[in-house]
Amino acid sequence: MKTSVNLAGVELKNPVMTASGTFGSGAEYSEFVDLKELGAVVTKGVANVPWPGNPTPRIAEVYGGMLNAIGLQNPGIDVFCERDIPFLKQFDTKIVVNVCGRTTEDYCEVVERLTSEPVDLLEINISCPNVKEGGIAFGQDPKAVEAITREVKKYAKQPIIMKLSPNVTDITEMARAAEAGGADVLSLINTLTGMKIDIERQKFAIANKTGGM
C-alpha cells in the first residue's frame, strides 16, 4: 500500500510526524522509536541563542491531560546545527525544524542560518510573544502573522510551515493572513492555554501560572 504524501513539494514516506516539543530533537527517543519509520521528525523549537526556559515546576497533571510551560528551552541554533542535525541525518526520514523567536529578526536569523543545512522544511512557531509589540503573541494579530510570514519567506530556502495559535477569536483570519504572507503549509494547532490551582497550597500548580494543554 502506498503511504507516501507530498508536503509542499517534499515527499514523505508516510504522513506520521512527531509534534514539536514532545519529541526533543529525536535523539532523546531514538532508543524507543525507530526514527526511520517516521515520515518526518519535527524538532523542538530552536532560537538564535540559547533559551533557559521557565522556572520549575513546569508540568502539572490535569483531568484528561497535562499542562506544560517549558518556556521553549533550547541550546540555540549553533549547538543545534553542530549536534542535532548530524544525528538526525543518520536516519532515512525528513527533518522539520521548529523555529522560535522574540522578534522578527530572531526568526529570520535562524531561518537564514538553516538555508545551508540539510533540513527539509521549517515550522515557524508564532505563539511566541512579540517583545517589540508589548508581548502579544505574533499569532494573535493577523497583521503580524502576515508580516512575519512574508519576512521569513525572504530568507528561507526550504518550504515554510506556519504553526498557528488556537488562542484567538477566529483562527481562519490568522490562516488567511499566513496564506497572504506566502506560507507553504499551515500547522493547526499549537497548545491551548490553561491553568491549574493547587487548592491545598492556594498557589498555581506551575511557576509560570499558565501553560499549554
Regions found by a protein language model. Name each.
Residues 1-95, 101:
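N-terminal capping/small domains of soluble enzymes
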Residues 31, 35, 90, 102-213:
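Alpha/beta enzyme core
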